[in-house]
Amino acid sequence: MKKNKKKMCAWLITMALGLAIVGCSNAKMTTTTETTIQQSKTTATNTSSITTVGEYSDEDLDTSYSDSDTKIELSTGSANITGDGATFEDGNIKITKAGTYVLSGDFDGQIITEVGDEDVVHLVFNGINITNTTSSAINAATGKKVVITLVDGTTNTLSDGTSYEYADGEDEPDATLFVKNNLTINGNGSLNIDSNFAAAIKSKDNLIILGGNIYIDSVDKAIKGKDSVTIENANITINAEDDGITTDGALVINSGNINIEKAGEGLEAITIDINGGNIDIVATDDGLNARGLLDDSASDEEKEAYGEENQADTYLKITGGVVNVDAGADGIDSNGQVYIEGGTVYISGATSGPDVALDYNGEATITSGTFVSTGVQEMSQTFSSNSTQNFITAYYSSALEAGTEIKVTDKSGNVVVSYTAAKSFSFAVISSDKLTAGETYTVTAGDNSSEVTIAAGGNTIGESTGGGPGGMGAPDGNGGPGGNPPTGEPPQKPTDANGNELEMPEPPSSNSSQTEKN
């Protein structure tokens, strides 16, 4: 993420105003769970109203196979094929017809599809271990859709080498499990992917995961669906050097367990909808990143201006589930909006500016749910004034160490909300539907204890000691203060992670267009 210039633009605006700134386990998974998705030509649902990319087709939901389907029994460098539509050629399995193929056994080579544009290929993984040292394990470069079913009780493994051999002018496949078009994964079995060259799972259209226990270890991205990613009823564990789950479109998580033990950015998409599930993210960069797209031909100035814009169609929305983020940069970073409408969200952001726990270009509102974020004061933001659920913005004069519990108790000593921060912090945003206007609460963090009588909207304890934009507080003055107190003195210049002052550029003025790129 391009952070420094983004933050420096905010500093320049501040100087012009001359006032306070206002907010600008490594063990592979074998647990099985039961898939319960209704086949009704409508969206599978665990709640009364959820957001999804589209309808699930019968093919997406089909986990069935029979004795009449083609069987492919793999045996290291050979295969025994019973049925039509598949051949063993040049050390690989080639599938040439639409249909269902049941695969089992160990294999050194590649599964290739060469089917028609409208064909659907159903691959049933019934205990496979496929390794290809010179390319991807699965190369579905043709067909309308590939559906992979993980048979209950089986463990299936895909792995590749550290380099791929390509024909002249080619650069695909570029993932251990590569699908040129649409990909659906369903079933209750396990899938382990050891990705040593590029991404682990990649679909260049829509990617749907409706079940399974998936473990990914990748030197690059873990899961990429170019147009969209939808996840339900799956258990996914990720260790990735690059992004955990990413798409150039919409990411929707309706249920399941997602454990991103390591990634650059945890979840990344144009729009992110989290409607349920348990999501744990440890990221070296942003935890949750809702961002737009630029054409590759855009200039640096256009890209910088684009990053500063409120991208109206870009958002992060959480309506349910439990989300826990430990981020090396921004915990939440939205180039547009942030909507917290339910669920439980815990965010631990960076320990030094300009990265913060909550970062947005448009607005951030909370209307329901539980939310706690901790981070630094520099460039910090809190919720916008049009939030309908009460919240507290807390400033601390010195950093509190990692492992410090921040909690809110009512006048009877009952804990309303608590969170143990993964990193040191000097700033926190706390919200709960149990924070009642007119009631007095105690906010405790380490040796710090403050009482606050809740007013509708935003409430503040402590004073800011860092430069940069504060949050959009309530209009009655109870909201988070912006940057330094308005003493007439200019705010501190933004610094890099080492505390060095950053050079001030001229603010960009160019506009840019939002278009897809591969």
Question: Which role fits each region the language model picked out?
Answer:
Residues 7-518:
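A composition-driven surface/loop motif
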Residues 1-7:
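Positively charged n-region of N-terminal signal peptides that target proteins for export
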